[in-house]
Amino acid sequence: MDGQHMVRGQLALRAMGVQGIPVVNVENACASASTALHMAVQHVRSGAADIVLAVGAEKMCIDDKARMFAAFDGAWDVHDTEAGKERLLAMGHGIAPPPGSQSLRPYSLFMDVYAAMGCMHMREFGTTQQQFAAVAAKNHGHSAHNPLAQYREAISVEQVLAAPPISYPLTLPMCSPVSDGAAAAIVCNESGLKCLQGDARRAVRVLACVLQTGSERASNDLENHLVRKAAHRLYEQSGV
């Protein structure tokens, strides 16, 4: 949010003494951190390094809400914005939002996109708003046990449904909050693990890690959905 776009990693890590090694800054929308992890895995598997640190960080909380939400404007084709929005929102056609189910306060347009995806799921599979609420309640239930979670209060399905509406079928607890936070993963081979004096019993083995982008398709053509395609590649590589 402060315009530090080009050398974030170099500047953030230098104060901790991390310098003189390759640092790659990754921007890939909501997949930025997982893309960094994918690159780390490939780097180690190629033999280019024994140890790679993959860091995901986000800094979104500022007082200027308009500027904060404007940060998402570059997450689609800025030269064809309206057509892109229209195409995405069309996924929800056929499901009429009940009266009072849309927020009158400003929020990210991506909530409308996710709501359209939810409406498409309702139309195609008979999914209910209560089932979406059950997912949110389950996730908030898990966060109550995580001391590092942004929100740590358990919430019932009924409370999720009674919460302020955002964009039907989504209510506030179903939506991603604006956050400041970070996470990191150390990716290494056996030599790297020994160098770090790590406990092999705690190490998580990466069987497969794939990265895939979407392709032109009808919104209800789920056979060619990028998640399905990526999952099949993942299962093939991992032998699961």
Q: What residue spans do the PLM features occupy?
A:
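Phosphate/pyrophosphate-binding loops at sites that engage ATP/ADP/AMP, CoA/4′-phosphopantetheine
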Residues: H121-G126, A230-V240
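Active-site-proximal alpha-helical scaffold in enzymes
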Residues: N28-E58, M111-H145, A185-S191
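Short acidic, glycine/serine/threonine-rich loops at helix termini
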Residues: D63-F69, A144-P147, G198, R217-S219
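Condensing-enzyme catalytic core mediating Claisen C-C bond formation in acyl metabolism
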Residues: E86-L104, A134, P165-R233, Q237
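Beta-strand segments within the central parallel beta-sheet cores of soluble alpha/beta enzyme folds
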Residues: M1, P22-N28, V52-G56, Q130-A137, ...
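Generic structural marker for isolated residues within well-ordered, non-membrane alpha-helices
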Residues: G9, G118, A231
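ATPase catalytic-site recognition across NTP-hydrolyzing enzymes
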Residues: N139-H140, A144-R152, E158
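Conserved catalytic cysteine-centered active-site region
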Residues: D2-I51, K59-Y114, Y151-P177, L207-C209, ...
